[in-house]
Amino acid sequence: SKRKAPQESLNEGITDFLVELANYERNVNRAIHKYNAYRKAASVIAKYPQKIKSGTEAKKLDGVGAKIAEKIDEFLTTGKLRKLEKIRNDDTSSSINFLTRVTGIGPAAARKFFDEGVRNLEDLKKIEHKLNHHQQIGLKYFEEFEKRIPRSEMQKMEALILKELDIVDPEYIGTICGSYRRGAESSGDIDILLTHPDFTSQSEKQPKLLHAVVDHLESIGFITDTLSKGDTKFMGVCQLQKEKEEEEEESLHRRIDIRLIPKDQYYCGVLYFTGSDIFNKNMRTHALEKGFTLNEYTIRPLGVTGVAGEPLLVDSEKDIFEYIQWKYREPKDRSE
C-alpha cells in the first residue's frame, strides 16, 4: 500500500524519519536493500517500550546498525537530520516521491515523468493524455485515495461484500486481509481474498469465479472503476452507496483489490496477506528452522537435501502454525 498506518510510539520522531529515508531509498534511488534496512529498524524501534536516549542504546536492537545509530544521535541532539533536510529541499527527490503517491505510477514512471518536466498534480493533469488508464484513475481520485479508511467504514464494506458474495454463490469464502484484519484503526485500501471449492491448484483456471463477483459488485454500484482485471486478480475503485437518500456526505472512492485463490492454497494466502511483513518474515524463518518452506501459496516439508516436498494439506491458518510447532497467534497479535 502507498500509505502506511500512523505509528503511535514513544519514539515517533525516530520512526518517522526512518520511514521517510526508506521511501527515499526505494522511490528515488531504487535501493531496495536500503529501504528494507530502514523499514526494519523503524519497526523494531516502534515496538521498543522505552524512549530512546542515544544511538548506542538503539544499536543494541536487532536491525539497528552503526550508520542508523549515528543518525539517531544526530536527531536526538539537533532535533533534525542533515540528510533529510537535503532530501526535502531537493526538487528531484521530493517530486519523484510525490509522483509515486499516484496509484499506477511506480518509481520508474515517476522518474520518466520527472525527466519530462512533471513536478506536481497540475503538471500531471496537463499530460493526462500520456497517462495509461490506471494512472488516469489514480490522478482522478488522487485526493480521495490519499485519505485513510476509518475502521468503521471498513466494517461496513466488509459486511456489504460478504453479503453480496453470498448472493452470487453461498459457496464463496471471502476474507478482508491487510492491517484491517489485524485490528488496525484505519487502512490504506481494501484487500479481499476470495476462494471457491470449484477452484483448486489442480483444476483449470476459473476466471469466471472472479468476474462474476466483480460484475455483481459493479451492478450494485459498489465498484465504480476498473484498473486491471485478470484471471485471478482484480484491481479497482469502490464506493459505499448512501444508506439513506437524506445523507449529505458521499463516501469517498477507495482502492480495492480482489484476489481469487485456489481453495487448497487459500489459508497460506490469507496468512500472507494479513501480514505484517515483519511477522511473515519471522514466521518463514521459524518454518525453515523446523524444516518447512512457507510462502503465500503453500507450506512444504524440506528434505535432507533441501529440496521441497509436496504441499501439505491446509484447511485453516491454525494448521500452518501447528505444522511448524508455533503457538497460534490471533491476527491482532501479528505486528511482529
Curated annotation (Swiss-Prot):
Residues reported in the UniProt entry to bind Mg(2+) 1: 189, 191
Alphabetized InterPro entries for the sequence: DNA-dir_DNA_pol_X, DNA_pol-X_BS, DNA_pol_b-like_N, DNA_pol_B_palm_palm, DNA_pol_lambd_fingers_domain, DNA_pol_lamdba_lyase_dom_sf, DNA_Pol_thumb_sf, DNA_pol_X
Binding, K(+) 1: 59, 61, 64
Localization in the cell: Nucleus; Cytoplasm
UniProt record similarity statement: Belongs to the DNA polymerase type-X family.
Ligand binding (Na(+) 2): 100, 102, 105
UniProt entry keywords in alphabetical sequence: Cytoplasm, DNA damage, DNA repair, DNA replication, DNA synthesis, DNA-binding, DNA-directed DNA polymerase, Lyase, Magnesium, Metal-binding, Methylation, Nucleotidyltransferase, Nucleus, Potassium, Sodium, Transferase, Ubl conjugation
Note on how the cofactor is bound: Binds 2 magnesium ions per subunit.
UniProt protein name: DNA polymerase beta
GO-annotated biological processes: base-excision repair; DNA damage response; DNA replication; double-strand break repair via nonhomologous end joining
Active site: 71 (nucleophile)
Post-translational modification: Methylation by PRMT6 stimulates the polymerase activity by enhancing DNA binding and processivity.
GO molecular function: 5'-deoxyribose-5-phosphate lyase activity; class I DNA-(apurinic or apyrimidinic site) endonuclease activity; DNA binding; DNA-directed DNA polymerase activity; lyase activity; metal ion binding
Cofactor: Mg(2+)
UniProt cross-references to PANTHER family, sorted A to Z: DNA POLYMERASE BETA, DNA POLYMERASE TYPE-X FAMILY MEMBER
Omega-N-methylarginine, modified sites: 82, 151
Binding annotation for Mg(2+) 2: 189, 191, 257
Cellular component GO terms held in the UniProt record: cytoplasm; nucleus
UniProt-annotated binding residues for a 2'-deoxyribonucleoside 5'-triphosphate: 148, 179, 182, 188-189
Region (DNA-binding): 182-191
Catalyzed chemical reaction(s): DNA(n) + a 2'-deoxyribonucleoside 5'-triphosphate = DNA(n+1) + diphosphate; a 5'-end 2'-deoxyribose-2'-deoxyribonucleotide-DNA = (2E,4S)-4-hydroxypenten-2-al-5-phosphate + a 5'-end 5'-phospho-2'-deoxyribonucleoside-DNA + H(+); 2'-deoxyribonucleotide-(2'-deoxyribose 5'-phosphate)-2'-deoxyribonucleotide-DNA = a 3'-end 2'-deoxyribonucleotide-(2,3-dehydro-2,3-deoxyribose 5'-phosphate)-DNA + a 5'-end 5'-phospho-2'-deoxyribonucleoside-DNA + H(+)
Gene giving rise to this polypeptide: polb
Function, as annotated: Repair polymerase that plays a key role in base-excision repair. During this process, the damaged base is excised by specific DNA glycosylases, the DNA backbone is nicked at the abasic site by an apurinic/apyrimidic (AP) endonuclease, and POLB removes 5'-deoxyribose-phosphate from the preincised AP site acting as a 5'-deoxyribose-phosphate lyase (5'-dRP lyase); through its DNA polymerase activity, it adds one nucleotide to the 3' end of the arising single-nucleotide gap.
EC number(s) stated in the UniProt entry for this protein: 2.7.7.7, 4.2.99.-, 4.2.99.18
Main localization (coarse): nucleus
